[in-house]
From Swiss-Prot:
Lineage, uppermost ranks: Bacteria, Bacillati, Bacillota, Bacilli, Bacillales
Reaction equations catalysed: 1-(5-phospho-beta-D-ribosyl)-ATP + H2O = 1-(5-phospho-beta-D-ribosyl)-5'-AMP + diphosphate + H(+)
UniProtKB keywords: Amino-acid biosynthesis, ATP-binding, Cytoplasm, Histidine biosynthesis, Hydrolase, Nucleotide-binding
Organism: Bacillus cereus (strain ATCC 10987 / NRS 248)
Broad enzyme group: hydrolase
GN (gene name): hisE
One GO CC annotation: cytoplasm
Name of this chain's protein: Phosphoribosyl-ATP pyrophosphatase
InterPro entries: HisE (IPR008179), PRib-ATP_PPHydrolase-like (IPR021130)
Amino acid sequence: MKNAFTLLFETIEERKRNPLPESYTNYLFSKGEDKILKKIGEECTEVIIASKNNDNEELVKEIVDVLYHCFVLLAEKNISLEDIMEEVTERNGKLSRVGDRREIDTL
């Protein structure tokens, strides 16, 4: 059984190959990379707002929106979900040197 991320990504790829006139995914592909990137930025802002408002229900929805738009970007750039999963797998369990990372200032 395929997981929800795989099913979503396959649907997005199908829309890219066989556009449907009323499809939002098709709309994004027709507008191109700049529109897709703009939507990712907008959705990331909405994630921040939902988190700052302590609205977990809205936060979940906005994170799903970010993931969807990132998946559209992956399809636009011809990057497979498998490429992403391989990178996640490679990074999983690796030790990270916190001292090498720039400190995050409070907002």
